[in-house]
Design a protein with these regions (language model features):
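Low-complexity, glycine/alanine/valine/leucine- and proline-rich hydrophobic stretches
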Residues: 214, 219-271
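Phosphate-end processing signature that detects enzymes handling 5′-triphosphorylated RNA
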Residues: 2-27, 111, 117-122, 231-232
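TerminUS-proximal long segments
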Residues: 2-3, 8, 260-310
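N-terminal ordered "arm"
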Residues: 9-74
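Glycine-rich, often proline-containing surface loops adjacent to acidic residues and nearby aromatics
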Residues: 14, 84-97, 130-150, 236-238, ...
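Aromatic/basic-lined ligand-recognition segments
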Residues: 140-227
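Long, hydrophobic/aromatic-enriched structural stretches that serve as scaffold segments
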Residues: 57-135
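Short conserved micro-motifs at the rims of enzyme active sites and ligand-binding pockets
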Residues: 67-69, 249-255, 280-284
Length: 310
């Protein structure tokens, strides 16, 4: 079996171990920190279809907001996991840096807001975390206060590798596709393909959730991603799901052999450790992405000839 692409690396250092038990407290803290930064981007950027103005993006040293407009200036915010800093850079000479170290979410939140004000950037965000159980307002969260720099660098190394594979996978589709982006609510890296057809209207009982989900899933999609944990699976895994999922989607044969369908989640999963241990992790991951996409596209009767690169 040959590597998927020569520009992608199968080196073990690019696919390090990352078990949740080893960094659970840091994960919970970093999740809140990324939500603070992500909400700043959300507040100051124009809304895009499918909430594409929400995510962060993998950068050479961590996660970045990309450019955020602010009056006659622009700025960005980057978690630099290589230097253990949150960097805030403006289009004028001003900048600020906050240390990434063991500290409470409340302290981090206050320092981020103070740093923005020092750069003449005023912004207010809803300070309640999302997509977590028992949320604590950012300014009152003294519970989450851990930072294991080594674990975070391993996370960053994985994100770099996965981002590269996802971008190659994305290049093989000529239909509408999302960027490869990091959603701070669910704390996962994802890429989404679209059939071009509208999806059925959502019927979620909660009206707020229904509005959010209707925008996210206004059109038929097949989405793949990676998360370091999930409420159902407390370990890192790759996933793929279809919305709407056509009849027979869950019964399709996918690759590699270790991949499986999780009925509670309604997703195909491939545990990260199965990829990491493979001789060619990039090839194994690409097999999962391609075969699960084909499972959704075939059962969903997508126009594959028109949508896929020749």
């Amino acid at each position: 079996m040959a590597p998927a692409r020569s520009t992608l690396s199968d080196s073990p250092e690019c696919w390090p171990t990352l078990h949740l038990a080893d960094w659970k407290d840091t994960y919970a803290t970093l999740h809140m920190w990324t939500q603070i930064v992500g909400k700043i981007r959300l507040e100051l950027t124009p809304r895009l279809n499918h909430w594409w103005n929400v995510p962060l993006y993998v950068s050479p040293h961590g996660l970045t907001t990309s450019l955020i407009p602010y009056g006659n200036r622009q700025f960005d915010m980057e978690f630099n996991f290589f230097a253990d800093q949150l960097l805030i850079r403006t289009s004028d000479p001003k900048s600020a840096a906050l240390a990434l170290k063991p500290r409470s979410v409340a302290d981090f939140y206050k320092e981020v807001m103070a740093a923005l004000r020092s750069l003449d950037i005023e912004v207010r965000i809803w300070n309640m975390p999302v997509e977590v159980a028992d949320p604590i307002p950012f300014d009152r969260d003294t519970v989450h206060a851990s930072y294991d720099a080594d674990a975070v660098r391993r996370l960053w190394r994985i994100l770099l590798s996965v981002d590269g594979v996802f971008k190659v996978f994305r290049s093989r589709f000529v239909g509408k596709s999302s960027p490869v982006h990091f959603f701070w609510g669910s704390f996962d890296l994802a890429v989404t393909r679209f059939s071009g057809r509208r999806a059925p209207q959502r019927n979620d009982p909660d009206p707020v959730l229904r509005k959010i989900m209707q925008e996210a899933y206004s059109h038929e999609v097949i989405s793949a991603g990676w998360w370091p944990r999930n409420a159902e699976i407390q370990e890192a895994a790759f996933y793929c799901y279809a919305v709407p999922a056509a009849s027979g989607f869950a019964e399709q044969k996918v690759h590699p052999a270790e991949a499986f369908y999780h009925s509670n989640l309604g997703e195909y999963l491939l545990m990260y450790d199965d990829v990491r241990r493979a001789k060619f992790p990039t090839t194994v991951l690409m097999e999962f992405l391609q075969s699960t996409y084909e499972a959704g596209a075939t059962t969903g009767k997508w126009d594959r000839e028109a949508l896929e690169a020749a």
